[in-house]
């Protein structure tokens, strides 16, 4: 996959943020995300032109079955009528977006994530002494290279690769500042399985946004992901298509002093 990021001003391009986080641990799958279409903004632009008049289809390539997506005004996203087809570990998926006579496509797989085994408050601090520690743990998948994205809310993210704990239990801490959480707050921590291409892409986005990049953020950059224009290749789109298995844990912040 070609991944390029530049902060230079450029001709507006279609931005395809096709991000599907599927929470599979409950009684039935639950989707966060969808397809958001817009035009790219230059560095100092505040307004992001949205696109609603496109045709969007996802194909389950093993079966060849097509699933159209429909625009939701309330969500600002193109969404499928069902998400059951998105959780096949053995199939590739193709998304096709048609807009203004141009056809854009991208492919991905459903990437699994280990469940969050532990999410509890600790009593360690960092620099100021008033940080709140959250201790997390999961069991890495054996015999494969894995990449994960942890979402701590408030546009706080941590990409993780399993290079140094392949197939092992991994325990780590995240520290919230006193400006980010307070006693009594309910926090939600989410884990997503991602591909190596998206892991690299997301790290580039973080480097351009002072660590505050995130899904559907209006990025002041030309961020080329895994989508291509098959009608006019030089008029390539920006953005990324991925489908991730996701898990989450919630906990209330307590006063441990």
Where are these regions (language model features)?
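A sequence/structural signal for flexible, mid-protein segments enriched
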Residues: 1-257
């Amino acid at each position: 996959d070609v991944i390029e990021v530049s902060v230079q001003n450029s001709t507006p391009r279609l931005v395809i943020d096709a991000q599907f986080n599927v929470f599979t641990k409950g009684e039935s799958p639950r989707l966060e995300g969808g397809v958001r279409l817009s035009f790219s903004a230059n560095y100092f632009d505040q307004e992001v032109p949205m696109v609603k008049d496109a045709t969007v289809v996802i194909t389950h390539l093993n079966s060849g079955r097509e699933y159209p997506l429909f625009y939701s005004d309330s969500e600002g996203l193109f969404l499928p009528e069902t998400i059951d087809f998105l959780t096949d570990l053995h199939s590739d998926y193709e998304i096709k977006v048609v807009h203004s006579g141009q056809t854009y496509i991208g492919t991905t797989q459903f990437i699994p994530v280990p469940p969050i085994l532990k999410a509890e408050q600790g009593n360690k601090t960092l620099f100021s002494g008033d940080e709140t520690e959250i201790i997390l743990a999961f069991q890495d998948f054996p015999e494969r290279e894995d990449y994960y994205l942890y979402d701590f809310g408030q546009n706080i993210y941590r990409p993780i690769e399993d290079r140094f704990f392949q197939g092992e239990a991994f325990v780590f801490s995240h520290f919230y500042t006193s400006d980010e959480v307070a006693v009594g707050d309910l926090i939600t921590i989410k884990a997503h399985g991602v591909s190596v291409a998206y892991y690299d892409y997301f790290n580039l986005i973080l480097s351009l946004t002072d660590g505050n990049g995130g899904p559907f953020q209006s990025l002041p950059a030309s961020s080329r992901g895994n989508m291509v224009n098959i009608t006019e290749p030089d008029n390539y789109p920006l953005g990324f298509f991925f489908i991730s298995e996701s898990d989450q844990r919630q906990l209330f912040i307590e006063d441990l002093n």
